[in-house]
């Protein structure tokens, strides 16, 4: 009897792993991404990526496939030293004037000054939902994990496994939510000296070029976008591989909420929901809702 139970358990585990395998990929960059610009300013080799920026050009890639719900993650090491004027970006996006987008952007700074972790979300073409943080670690002396988790209930931004931001789904109350467009994954390194560092006051020092940002071990556990049919398929809880539809992912745990609040209390430097001057007192409607 014990032998039969063991065999049954092994079968169940094997089936679960097979199901997970259809949605989980540690990507070979050269096979799973294409260069969108700066082909001679980048290097892809297996699970390693190098993006290069000099005065002539930057570089960017995008995934060959799009996803609707799940999680994507990448280990990233940012430009060291004086990175003023540079922006490294890692984000999900669809296309068109009513596109959806979920952003991580890393705004460089002068030597000795901290980076800015810039997050934003667009739904049906509408953005202006920025939240910014100072890193509580050195993002240039090693690789750190940046994860975007996206399900029918909420979008969560994670840094090294700790949530830093949540955007919840209030579509039933007329607030747009990114749930009807497949999004591809993008990574880029580019010059944004007109605004990126201290409002554009500090420019890029091109004598320090080339600037290099690195990525490693990109992984996607996400629903493959197959067109409009995916809008229903990717939220179907009866499909075993749709793990993100589990009620356990509809809201952060108490422990996660505690960790996130510590980061937000200690390291958040901008929240659009508190910028009454910018919106002239007419705040975005989601700002009055439960945030987490």
UniProtKB/Swiss-Prot annotation:
Contains at least one intrachain disulfide bond essential for its enzymatic activity. The active site is at 101 (nucleophile), 105 (proton donor). GO terms for cellular component: apoplast. The keyword Signal applies. Catalyzes xyloglucan endohydrolysis (XEH) and/or endotransglycosylation (XET). Cleaves and religates xyloglucan polymers, an essential constituent of the primary cell wall, and thereby participates in cell wall construction of growing tissues. Residues 28-215 form the GH16 domain. It comes from Arabidopsis thaliana (Mouse-ear cress). It is found in: Secreted, Cell wall; Secreted, Extracellular space, Apoplast. One of its GO terms (molecular function) is xyloglucan:xyloglucosyl transferase activity. One of its GO terms (biological process) is xyloglucan metabolic process. CDD domains: GH16_XET (cd02176). PANTHER family: XYLOGLUCAN ENDOTRANSGLUCOSYLASE/HYDROLASE PROTEIN 8-RELATED (PTHR31062). Its EC number is 2.4.1.207. The record marks 103 as: Important for catalytic activity. Pfam families: Glyco_hydro_16 (PF00722), XET_C (PF06955). This is Probable xyloglucan endotransglucosylase/hydrolase protein 26. Glycans are attached at residues 45, 109, 145, 205. Belongs to the glycosyl hydrolase 16 family. XTH group 2 subfamily. Disulfide bonds join 223-234, 273-287. Xyloglucan binds at residues 105, 118-120, 128-130, 194-195, 199, 278. Keywords: Apoplast, Cell wall, Cell wall biogenesis/degradation, Disulfide bond, Glycoprotein, Glycosidase, Hydrolase, Secreted, Signal, Transferase. Residues 1-27 form the signal peptide. It is an enzyme of class 2 (transferase). It catalyses: breaks a beta-(1->4) bond in the backbone of a xyloglucan and transfers the xyloglucanyl segment on to O-4 of the non-reducing terminal glucose residue of an acceptor, which can be a xyloglucan or an oligosaccharide of xyloglucan.
